[in-house]
Amino acid sequence: MNYMDDASTFERSFLQKARQQHIPITGALELLPLCNMNCDMCYVRLSRSEMECQGQLRTVDEWILLAQQMQKAGTLFLLLTGGEPLLFPDFKTLYLELRNMGMILTINTNGTLLDESWADFFAEYRPRRINITLYGADAASYNRLCHYPQGFDQTVRAIRLLRERNDDVKISCSVTKKNAHDFPKIFVLGEKLGVPVHADHYMMPAVRERSFPFDAQVRLNPEDAAALALQTLKLQLASDIFRQYVHESIHRVNNPSFPRGNGHISCLAGNCSFFINWHGFLFPCVMLSEISAPVFDLGFISAWEKVSAAAQKISLSSQCCQCRLQPICRTCVAAAFLETSSYRGMPGYLCRYSEHYYHLLLAEEASFSSIAL
């Protein structure tokens, strides 16, 4: 979760000040692990019987009491996620209580349950934004990846219902081997619906509560992931801005004086951002579950202080910090740990990703020169 990706200038100012003071201004609540779909790459989804073997859901009253502690600690932005958050009992009660506290709310949903009634609710009590994940461009892709063929039509319908009511919607797309061919179609669909598309081409090998290992065969190989990432930017950016991005990226790689950081967490995680899972453990981010504190037992402020302090102590390897490709690399401490089982490990997948991405940037720059001639 990176709130900065979609933050306005005003929000960025808030976030940066909170980061400097280690105020937990933004967070995410994973309300439950249940979902009506069963996507191959999901690291959260459990069946009801699997969930009950691990524990019970927190009640709406527990979440409200915790949110009151968050409010006192300075939390302003909250993401509600799951699983499928609309399956959470008393979701509307929790949502309205958080809204009445002044929280600025965003929702992650697969959209399949979002009918006219839900759309009317969100039109009356608007969130900041609703992020809807689109897993493919047709029913066949939904069947292959999510084992839920009707999901495509249901999701597109949900997007239309929300846009008809002028709600802010963003399409998220997790690109895998089973739906990579759909991405250009998803981008076109987003344009037709008047909704921006965010595609995630790098899939961290997370497992979390699921009892079986990550299916490495689902994610793209690093070269394909890098190619799709650059293709996405080319589709989304105006040609002059894309050229500028290519030139600046190459310059940063080849400029030894360009800052490469000290290897410590450079995003918001543990600095001013947190994630709380359905069990009630607070993490710096959804992918850093090795650093945690039981928030319902310790209280929010104590759990935040414990996790934030621990997060500031971890760092990447010196090899990663000194690598010339670091300015375009997607490695972070969470990715390093999930790829290698060590914060200071060298994540080979991302090394290959960055190498190929750099060669693609060089090819783009060469094409600019040939066009000019």
Language-model segments: residues:
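Accessory C-terminal segments flanking Radical SAM cores
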Residues: A28, V195, R208, P213-F214, ...
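Generic structural signal for helix capping and beta-alpha/helix-loop junctions
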Residues: S49, L87, D115, A139, ...
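Residue-level signal for the nucleotide or nucleotide-sugar donor/cofactor binding architecture
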Residues: R58, P89, Q150, K178-H181, ...
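A short acidic, glycine-rich active-site loop
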Residues: E52-Q56, N143, A310
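Radical SAM enzyme [4Fe-4S]-AdoMet core and its adjacent flexible, acidic
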Residues: E124-R128, T133-Y135, A140-A269, F275-H279, ...
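Short Fe-S-cluster ligation motifs
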Residues: L66-G82, G348-L373
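Alpha-helix termination/capping residues and helix-transition junctions
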Residues: Q69-K72, E124, K192, S317, ...
